[in-house]
């Protein structure tokens, strides 16, 4: 099975348009949208959701006031100042480190897992697709990218398809690293601008670091023929 990941050093280069074009031509493939922070492949694929599941990751502490003795130990130990004078934990400040849970003498602090988003298996006009949506301001997008890629492989195995086309996230951060690890190849979509070239060079270095074969597609090539030639 081959897995081709389309990535770019910056947003707006047109990689979703390119992968939609490839999807319309390729056969026996599964589509995968790994840009979970700003998924948009569904805009051109017109998916009909067949199944959906919650994505859970990380924890946020919550104090049960009925058991809390207000001893102040949790407020003293919290390095993120997430606990106010009324012993209420601000979920925006809580980093989920768990120190309040561990040291609370009354065992009054719950530590539920966060629901960060959803992932989907859909049928599209191009064929089956696995995609996801991370919640607003939620973290751990790299873990969701990994989950989406794993589910795409399972779906390809079930349907006996030999190609996965993945729309990866832009940039060079954690989500991109999660999207290219172990891939057969990456196609870097860039544009003929100074920022486009600079960001392309960074993502090429990233692909080389993980020993993933890289190819380059210069989209909107006629914007600057000189830079395209370079």
Regions found by a protein language model. Give the residues of each.
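Flexible beta-alpha connector loops of hexameric P-loop NTPases
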Residues: 133-142, 194
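Conserved catalytic-core segment of NTP-binding enzymes
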Residues: 106, 112-121, 143, 147-230
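P-loop NTPase switch/communication element
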Residues: 39-58, 121-123
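Iron-sulfur cluster-binding cysteine motifs and their immediate structural context
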Residues: 73-90, 99-115
